[in-house]
Swiss-Prot record:
GO terms for molecular function: ATP binding; CMP kinase activity; dCMP kinase activity. InterPro entries: Cytidylate_kin (IPR003136), Cytidylate_kinase_dom (IPR011994), P-loop_NTPase (IPR027417). It is an enzyme of class 2 (transferase). Pfam families: Cytidylate_kin. One of its GO terms (biological process) is pyrimidine nucleotide metabolic process. NCBIfam families: cmk. GO terms for cellular component: cytosol. This is Cytidylate kinase. It catalyses: CMP + ATP = CDP + ADP; dCMP + ATP = dCDP + ADP.
Length: 230
């Protein structure tokens, strides 16, 4: 049983990241954003593809041996910061902001859906877990990456509630958005995550289900902390 890892899985917008960061700060663990690793990997490959003379689309190129061989040239480092976003470095360059662009968000699915790239990221995560106590959020942390984690939680909420949260978040950032369109995107993302062939989203048999529809953020945090204290 792995006592260095607390796994938080669930669909997009269920509150995993916010909850994970605050719990990590309270119990002295480090919060690890697995999505940042996939984004950094996507950024590296996207740049490599853009600088190559090939005419293949990015989606097709990442399936080639040229793209897969480039994994040996990639070094992704994570700098932890209590209660804040991880700082991510790609081959020595800080890319914490560069990995959050709409372009990378759009292309990341081509990386996350391929086993060789998931294995690369998972290996990085396991290396970190040997050195640090981590609370990790994602889609398959408790089912595939760390199935031996001592504590596993699955956070969920209705698509309507998750869309409202995202809408308010965008408003705070001064970005105009449509609630209905956001909900449609969330529903499509759920379908894609749950039906993908590799590492689909589902609740682990031994994960504790928490419905964040009916609980405030502080209530969710309190509930998880009580379970961790048992």
């Amino acid at each position: 049983m792995n006592e260095n890892v607390i796994a938080l899985d669930g669909p997009a917008g269920s509150g995993k990241s916010t909850v994970a960061r605050q719990i990590a700060e309270r119990i002295g663990f480090n919060y690890l954003d697995t999505g940042a690793f996939y984004r950094a990997l996507t950024l590296y490959l996207f740049r490599l593809h853009g600088n190559s003379p090939n005419t293949e689309s990015f989606a097709d190129w990442v399936k080639t041996s040229e793209a897969e061989r480039s994994l040996s040239d990639i070094r992704i480092l994570c700098e932890f910061s209590a209660g804040k976003e991880n700082r991510i470095f790609l081959n020595g360059e800080e890319v914490s902001l560069a990995i959050r662009t709409p372009e990378i968000t759009r292309e990341i699915k081509h990386i996350a859906n391929r086993r060789i790239y998931r294995n690369f990221v998972n290996q990085e995560l396991h290396s970190l877990a040997k050195l640090h106590k981590l609370i990790i959020d994602g889609r398959d942390i408790g089912t595939e990456v760390f199935p031996d984690a001592k504590f596993k939680f699955y956070l969920t909420a209705s698509s309507k509630v998750r869309a409202e949260r995202r809408f308010l978040q965008l408003q705070e950032q001064g970005i105009e958005a449509d609630r209905d369109e956001i909900e449609k995107e969330i529903i499509l993302r759920d379908k894609s995550d749950m039906e993908r062939e590799i590492a689909p989203l589902y609740q682990a048999n031994d994960a504790i289900l928490i419905d964040t529809d009916i609980l405030s953020k502080n209530s969710v945090i309190s509930k998880i902390l009580k379970i961790l204290d048992r």
